[in-house]
Amino acid sequence: GAQTVLAELLQGEIFAFFLVFARLGSALMLLPGFGEIFVSTRIRLVFAFAMTVVVTPLVSEGLPTLPAEPISLAVLILGEIIIGVFLGTLSRLLLSMLQTAGTLIAHTTNLAAAQIFDPAQGTQGSLPGNFLTLMAILLIFVTNLHHVMLAALVGSYESFPAGVMPPLGDLAQLATRIVADGFFLALQIATPMIAVALMF
């Protein structure tokens, strides 16, 4: 009857919500500016929840239907978490290149021994590295780049459709290339300071 149809519709809506939340929540735990250790986990979860409420209607047409078997449901959720973690980790790698550049600068300017607490990583870091990282996080919000990151998460449903297990080999290859390019970029950022240190 009508109650059965309503119950099935409600189940489908709840399933769609949690499927989107799995991807967005796991990505927001790692995104620069959102995933920093000084940002409360509760705040991140509330923001992920609010964003899921907005995004779910936008992507609901491309979401799979609620599977009958629990194992299929678990695989779907796991796939979304993998995609979210991958997207968050990639953006985190791009930010970590600044910390690497700062460390290179510190070692060539005799600042390596001057360690300071890095609030972004929750560990000790070099002075130049901390400065570059915190400046990058500040610029992300000042220039509204966080809007671009959030839009990219929504756009990820075109590149990585929900319900389709991502090709792990391709993801690993992409991550490896970004790490290599990131280290090269960090070296380029540090090169002027290294050159000055070698001259004096």
Q: What is the role of each PLM region?
A:
Residues G1-F200:
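Hydrophobic alpha-helical segments and their helix-loop boundaries in membrane
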